Amino acid sequence: MSCGDAKLNHPAPHFNEVALMPNGTFKKVDLASYRGKWVVLFFYPLDFTFVCPTEICQFSDRVKEFNDVDCEVIACSMDSEFSHLAWTNVERKKGGLGTMNIPILADKTKSIMKAYGVLKEEDGVAYRGLFIIDPQQNLRQITINDLPVGRNVDETLRLVKAFQFVEKHGEVCPANWKPGSKTMKADPNGSQDYFSSMN
């Protein structure tokens, strides 16, 4: 599967762009500096909208769960860093972001969203793309939602843990796998242990 320059099991498109950081400062965020860690990169259409703050706040509030498994979370839209900052100064009960624990990239030229294949050309905004990048900076997962539907933080965290399990143990994760549940060997004989125990 590919989206723009983003292809599964290929290097994630590089970026080095200014972001609003959790401490309220502006700083360039270079994907290369995250080598050795897992990364969740998610795009959203616009600041000061409706579904977007529900997603961003969920990822921000739960970022420690990602950090605990050596994963960083980065948000991105086409808005400026100043717009991001203004949005964090609006309280959540009024649709703002409040305090953030994750960086928010300011993709003003739309180069990142083009590279990742999430630009909705007719509106000039990003679809709700989400990408999981492994420590070698290869893309392991790509999902893109149309604008009206938000994403599931639990499922994103589950996927990160599943890919990590596969990397560490060499077995594959069946449907609805969660840490601690059964996995299987990816061969005709080894997989029978799983199937016989589940059916």
UniProtKB/Swiss-Prot annotation:
Q: What are the positions of the active site?
A: C52 (cysteine sulfenic acid (-soh) intermediate)
Name the GO terms of the biological process aspect.
cell redox homeostasis; cellular response to stress; hydrogen peroxide catabolic process; response to oxidative stress
Database matches in InterPro entries: AhpC/TSA (IPR000866), Peroxiredoxin (IPR050217), Peroxiredoxin_AhpC-typ (IPR024706), Peroxiredoxin_C (IPR019479), Thioredoxin-like_sf (IPR036249), Thioredoxin_domain (IPR013766)
Where composition is biased (Polar residues), the residues are 189-199
Q: SUPFAM superfamilies this protein is in?
A: Thioredoxin-like
Q: Its Gene Ontology molecular function terms?
A: thioredoxin peroxidase activity
The GO cellular component terms are: cytosol
Reaction catalyzed: a hydroperoxide + [thioredoxin]-dithiol = an alcohol + [thioredoxin]-disulfide + H2O
Q: Where is this region: Disordered?
A: 179-199
Q: Which residues form the Thioredoxin domain?
A: 6-165
Q: What else is known?
A: The active site is a conserved redox-active cysteine residue, the peroxidatic cysteine (C(P)), which makes the nucleophilic attack on the peroxide substrate. The peroxide oxidizes the C(P)-SH to cysteine sulfenic acid (C(P)-SOH), which then reacts with another cysteine residue, the resolving cysteine (C(R)), to form a disulfide bridge. The disulfide is subsequently reduced by an appropriate electron donor to complete the catalytic cycle. In this typical 2-Cys peroxiredoxin, C(R) is provided by the other dimeric subunit to form an intersubunit disulfide.
Subunit (UniProt): Homodimer; disulfide-linked, upon oxidation.
Q: Would you tell me the protein name for this molecule?
A: Thioredoxin peroxidase
